[in-house]
Amino acid sequence: MKINFKAAKKLREILVQAVYQFLFNNQDTSEIYDQFVKEHQNKKIDLEILNSKLRSIELNSQKIDQAIDKTDFDISKIDLIDKAILYVAFEEIIFGELDHPVVIDEAIRLSKKFSNPDSFKFLNAIIDKYIKL
């Protein structure tokens, strides 16, 4: 299902927040999804895609961790918000249809919005290294 660029950007922002909550609270994604539906029901986002990606991240979190580990970066030392951004990016790389440059650009944008000012360099290095494997 295709969505427009602006809606896709907003969806990724909400997805990062939902994944952060999943990682922080170790909470079932169906509960997180229900909460986000209530909070964002009047916004123009595709809740079906949000649910699908959130479930994919939950079900494939070990695969995503293994993919990040292949880059020789210690997943346990990555800040939680950066880990959430990486989970969204790696889900799109491994299971999605987006071109890799788009995934990298979006991870950088999300990092600049949600994380510390220099995190985007670190995230870019991890994603770039994985893509080149």
State where each predicted segment sits:
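N-terminal interaction/assembly modules
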Residues: 1-113, 117-120, 124-133
